[in-house]
Amino acid sequence: MSRIAIFFPGIGYTMDRPLLHFSRRLAAEMDYEIKPITYGGFPQQVRGDRGKMEECFRLALRQSVEFLRDVDLTAYDDILFIGKSVGTIVAACLASQSAARERIRLVLYTPLEDTFTFRLSEAIAFTGGNDLWVGGKESRIAALCAARNIPCTVIPDANHSLETNDVQKDIETLREVMERTRQFIVRRIDKAIE
């Protein structure tokens, strides 16, 4: 069974940050070919500025399309798109347009509302209960997930990095998020073995 995991980072949340670093390690342990995308050229002070956010999406989308130009997704049996923040929008957009869309599963770390403007087939989401990028305590992410039957874990008091001011709590949160991510990934592998 051929497997690939493509990573779509956030604006400032790169592959060396905990959520993406450990999810990459999980996927590698399960024999996924790893393809991390890197972006560049984003504007500064994006949060709260719709125009700058759209510019970030366009830049990330263009760079992702270029990065994936020579990757034939239809050659893979199992495809993971793992995104963080703006990367979740790019991942959802590309998944919805892909000829292999029925084989693409998405892991959405702190998705933004625009992520849900695209058709998502199989996904899991994680959001912070105090994520100011999506309205903090007024966030609609959990409701958007529920409307699409996407399991969503809300981490109380966590910010856009799924962190709080309590280091021990953050370590436990990371452990919980990685375990749920692992279970999501393993489900497809287990089905293929049956």
Where are the regions that the model predicts?
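Short alpha-helix in the alpha/beta-hydrolase fold that links the catalytic acid
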Residues: 20-21, 121, 134-144
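Serine-hydrolase catalytic machinery in alpha/beta-hydrolase-like enzymes
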Residues: 2-76
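Short beta-strand/loop motif that positions the catalytic acidic residue
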Residues: 125-131
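Catalytic histidine-centered segment of alpha/beta-hydrolase-like enzymes
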Residues: 158-173
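Conserved beta-strand segments of alpha/beta enzyme cores
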Residues: 33, 105, 149-151
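Primarily recognizes the serine-hydrolase "nucleophile elbow" in alpha/beta-hydrolase
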Residues: 64-121
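C-terminal alpha-helix
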Residues: 176, 180-192
